[in-house]
Design a protein with these regions (language model features):
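N-terminal leader/targeting and accessory segments in enzymes
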Residues: 1-92, 96
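Walker A (P-loop) phosphate-binding motif
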Residues: 95-115
Length: 115
């Protein structure tokens, strides 16, 4: 899957990357868990700003980065997409990477009034 395909159904994207790349590993917000060919989601946390870890994840093989800061404010040499809210797009990005598995499920509900 290409980065542009991963982002296609995601709302809240402020700036799309100018380049595309092949994504061969999952999305992660944990810099230590990013796999070569994967996507790093950089967001500002309570104690650590994930944007500061972008050079490290790129050195470890990240193919692309999604972050909350404007592209001009981050040190990123791979395709970068800016989003409004990193936490809000984490689930949809993971679902997109895995081909939206919940769309293939049939949900059946059973309800009752006693008990």
């Amino acid at each position: 899957m290409y980065f542009s395909e991963l982002l296609a159904d995601i709302s809240g994207i402020v700036a799309f990357p100018s380049a595309d790349t092949l994504i061969t590993a999952p999305v992660s917000e944990n810099a230590q868990a990013v796999q070569p060919g994967g996507v790093f989601l950089a967001r500002k946390g309570a104690n650590i700003d994930g944007h500061d870890l972008i050079p490290e994840v790129i050195n470890n093989g990240a193919a692309a980065v999604v972050g909350e800061y404007p592209p001009g404010l981050v040190d990123c040499t791979v395709p970068y997409a800016q989003v409004e809210d990193g936490m809000a797009v984490l689930g949809p990005l993971a679902a997109a990477y895995y081909g939206f598995p919940s769309r293939k499920l049939t949900v059946i509900g059973v309800t009752g009034t006693d008990g």
